[in-house]
């Protein structure tokens, strides 16, 4: 393509937003709403439409950054949903609509979307069509699975994760997740088939 998509916090905009620009760095345009916090912007194949996650339906303000009273933690904002839009930001459409964190979405070469969600009470990986249809849960184990990416041919998904057995560490993980937080600890890299097998 002829444009890049990226997230950044610019002067006058309090939270990260999604922008596009020409390959030479000119013609920078905000393509997200300017409200809430956004993450993980991608072009669909062909470059005519984009995908990103945003908290803007939960409020125009930035969601609060986590404090570190509980150690080093990351926010897992339950107001994140996944959206598609035309490449210029028009035609914004919400494609996830369940309670809880839906973010970290990426796109395969065929336009299928893979993402992280806590819709079932744990950080798991799901896939869906670019319009939100044909939702499939791909992982099912205790502990955080996320950050999925398709292989170049779309046949595999690589992701970070960790299975946490019952016990104090899992209890801490669930307690934090119920507060919209996650403590990234030891994680491993996994590869599975695009349908969640192997």
Predicted regions and their residues:
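A flexible loop/linker signature enriched in serine peptidases of the S9 family
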Residues: 7-18, 32-38, 53-82, 96-102, ...
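A short glycine/small-residue-enriched secondary-structure motif
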Residues: 19-28, 33, 49
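Conserved active-site beta-strand-loop modules that form the wall/rim of enzyme catalytic pockets
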Residues: 146, 156-157
């Amino acid at each position: 393509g002829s444009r890049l998509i990226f997230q950044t916090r610019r002067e006058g905009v309090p939270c990260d937003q999604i922008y596009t620009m020409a390959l030479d760095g000119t013609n920078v345009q905000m393509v997200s709403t300017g409200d809430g916090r956004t993450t993980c912007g991608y072009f669909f194949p062909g470059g005519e439409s984009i995908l990103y996650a945003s908290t803007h339906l939960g409020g125009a303000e930035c969601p609060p950054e986590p404090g570190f009273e509980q150690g080093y933690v990351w926010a897992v904002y339950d107001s994140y949903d996944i959206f598609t839009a035309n490449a210029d930001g028009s035609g914004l459409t919400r494609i996830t609509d369940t309670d809880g964190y839906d973010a970290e979405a990426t796109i395969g070469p065929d336009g299928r979307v893979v993402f992280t969600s806590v819709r079932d009470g744990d950080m798991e990986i799901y896939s869906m069509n670019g319009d939100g249809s044909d939702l499939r849960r791909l992982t099912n184990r205790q502990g955080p699975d996320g950050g999925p990416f398709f292989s170049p041919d779309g046949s595999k998904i690589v992701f970070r994760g960790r299975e946490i057995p019952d016990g104090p560490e899992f209890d801490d993980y669930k307690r934090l997740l119920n507060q919209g937080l996650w403590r990234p600890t030891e994680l491993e890299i996994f590869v599975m088939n695009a349908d969640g097998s192997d």
